[in-house]
């Protein structure tokens, strides 16, 4: 569990339960997202702040991970169709490295349609990280290679560099927009961005205004009612 209501707990999950959750998250959530935002829907990909990392294993070899990671792993074959981050990025354990690379591939995608994370606090972490690192990220887009300071396996880095390719025009555009300031930056660098998919409300609502500073009040949509224990429902 995430530990938002106390200490983290281990909840056993069967393959049947994984398939059930994956079916709803992979099929119904996009459908209801379309219903809510069809005026600007482009069928574009999104930036998803998640991973498919197995944290550890039991003595018997059963993998232990967050519910989100397990769910993402179960739909691994279609992840590249839904999200801008390559599979290799979702397999990185280090949080800062992961955020950097999630952003790098999202910044290359001028038609990004949505940003998604489990909790809105993660969205804010991402946007603050963008504020601190946008100059390095733009340089990487210009050169088509990942900054030397990003510590990742050399073979993984080689694979990702092949996917980047230099894009001076995109780098010039990003430099121009960031020079205007960070307020509303998301809507300016991703003009087709139409919603933020994440859990907010209640205790999380304190993050809304901080996120809105960067997004210029792009709608925040909580698509599902879910817990580690199981899928509860969809928010149409």
PLM region spans:
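Active-site phosphate/ATP/adenylate-binding loop shared across adenylate-forming ligases
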Residues: 4-236
